[in-house]
């Protein structure tokens, strides 16, 4: 089984004994400045103690008042999930307590298979359901990209088509009942989809941007919205890379739906799935039961983590 999550001390079912009058949820953040919302719907500007930055959009936190408009975040409550990325130099928390990741992609501008596969891997590692959203599906360039995405449907990842000029209603049943996050490259239409889903709430986003001194750069930080009483949506900044250095190489096969059933079936328990005889992974790729490209991806990520 996969190793213990590096943030496992903060992932569990929230304690029902926590009092509600001193708790809030982070709905936006930039650096060490945050916007939090209490259970009664009141929003506050928030700072942290001792320059802490280990908070994420979606975190439920304990707060202490500073004045009528400001509070201090004391700590986060136990997390149900944590989505983050890590390269060789730094860790970037993306969102906490999400139950569903929607990877927004489109044929234009040029989509990244590398980013898609890495985001899917991160979702598997975090125990978060992943959905692929094919936006701008009415573009003529879409057909070839859709054909490539159909492979991921065979792995169990739904592919939902949306069109920028429509109202994103095809997404609403998928989002319902989940704490969702939209993630993808810049230019894929995440914010446009968010605005379509929010409708009349869109005009309120300027207040948060002003509070964070972010001006017009409304996609430089993650932001959480309530779509209804049971559904939340986080719009996140566009990204080009998704570091996976927080994962353990030995755990990787568990995060591949196309290979996890083969774990333990190789002749050697320490098989690297390369040149060893009796490798179940290699056999699956050679017979067409699994994709050779996916095996190469697994090998590449393994090398990256061990390098």
From Swiss-Prot:
Cofactor binding mode and count: Binds 1 zinc ion per subunit.
Record bears the keyword Hydrolase: yes
Subcellular location(s) per record: Cytoplasm
GO biological process terms, semicolon-separated: ribosomal small subunit biogenesis
Residue sites binding Zn(2+) per the record: 266, 271, 273, 279
Gene3D superfamilies listed in its UniProt record: P-loop containing nucleotide triphosphate hydrolases (3.40.50.300), Probable gtpase engc, domain 3 (1.10.40.50)
Gene Ontology molecular function terms on file: GTP binding; GTPase activity; metal ion binding; rRNA binding
Top-level taxon in the UniProt lineage: Bacteria
Enzyme Commission number, as recorded: 3.6.1.-
Cystines in this chain: none
Keywords: Cytoplasm, GTP-binding, Hydrolase, Metal-binding, Nucleotide-binding, Ribosome biogenesis, RNA-binding, rRNA-binding, Zinc
EC primary class: hydrolase
Cofactor(s) this protein cannot do without: Zn(2+)
Start and end residues of each CP-type G domain: 85-242
GO cellular component labels: cytoplasm
Residue ranges with Polar residues bias: 10-21
Entry-linked SUPFAM superfamilies: P-loop containing nucleoside triphosphate hydrolases
UniProt region (Disordered), positions on chain: 1-21
Reported function: One of several proteins that assist in the late maturation steps of the functional core of the 30S ribosomal subunit. Helps release RbfA from mature subunits. May play a role in the assembly of ribosomal proteins into the subunit. Circularly permuted GTPase that catalyzes slow GTP hydrolysis, GTPase activity is stimulated by the 30S ribosomal subunit.
The protein's name: Small ribosomal subunit biogenesis GTPase RsgA
Organism, as annotated: Neisseria gonorrhoeae (strain NCCP11945)
């Amino acid at each position: 089984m996969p190793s213990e999550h590096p943030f496992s001390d903060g992932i569990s079912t929230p304690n029902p004994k926590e009092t509600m009058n001193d708790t809030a949820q982070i709905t936006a953040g930039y650096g060490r400045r945050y916007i939090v919302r209490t259970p009664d719907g009141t929003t506050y500007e928030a700072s942290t103690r001792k320059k802490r930055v280990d908070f994420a959009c979606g975190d439920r936190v304990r707060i202490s008042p500073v004045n009528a408009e400001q509070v201090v975040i004391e700590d986060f409550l136990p997390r149900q999930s944590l989505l983050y990325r890590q390269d060789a130099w730094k860790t970037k928390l993306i969102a906490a307590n999400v139950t569903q990741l929607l990877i927004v992609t489109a044929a234009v501008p040029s989509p990244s298979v590398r980013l898609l596969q890495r985001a899917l891997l991160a979702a598997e590692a975090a125990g978060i359901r992943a959905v692929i959203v094919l936006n701008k599906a009415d573009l003529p360039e879409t057909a070839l990209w859709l054909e490539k995405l159909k492979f991921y449907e065979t792995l169990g990842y739904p592919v939902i088509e949306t069109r920028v000029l429509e109202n994103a209603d095809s997404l609403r049943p998928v989002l319902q009942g989940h704490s969702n996050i939209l993630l993808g490259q810049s230019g894929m239409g995440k914010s446009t989809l968010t605005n379509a889903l929010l409708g009349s709430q869109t005009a309120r986003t300027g207040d948060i941007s002003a509070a964070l001194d972010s001006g017009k750069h409304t996609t430089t930080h993650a932001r959480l919205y309530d779509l209804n009483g049971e559904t939340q949506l986080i719009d996140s900044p566009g990204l080009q890379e998704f570091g996976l250095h927080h994962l353990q190489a030995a755990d990787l096969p568990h995060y591949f739906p196309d290979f996890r059933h083969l774990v333990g079936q190789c002749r050697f328990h320490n098989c690297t799935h390369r040149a060893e005889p009796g490798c179940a992974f290699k056999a699956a790729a050679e017979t067409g039961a699994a994709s050779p490209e996916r095996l190469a991806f697994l090998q590449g990520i393994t090398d990256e983590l061990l390098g």
